[in-house]
């Protein structure tokens, strides 16, 4: 129902974000990691070795190995939620944080950072876009599973006259 498109480097530059002025990056997903390093490459920004990385989970932190050598002294991770990660971020409150995110970032992330007086800036590096599903008009499904509100918005956009009938709907 949805897909992700990277923000072009031209649009990123219009956000007036100087990547070199940040000492730490907060990653909430693998997608954020991919697009952070994509933008760094497109803007010819050489990520410094002393950059610190804060990841929402251990799985996300291990994904960083695709882009850099994994060092425990500069990569930190929470247990699974952003609230867990905030404990580590608060311990390193002297850092200047960049938060790579989608155009539809959850509000709890900036709210928690502001509440704890963390110096941060959101960087929209990718957009969540409704996929064109017009070719599926006549197909009937037993179950539709949605993993985010964006999927439901895509259903409504693609099929404005959608009737549930006997179709079961599940949400994660």
Language model features with spans:
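Signature of uroporphyrinogen-III synthase
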Residues: 1-172
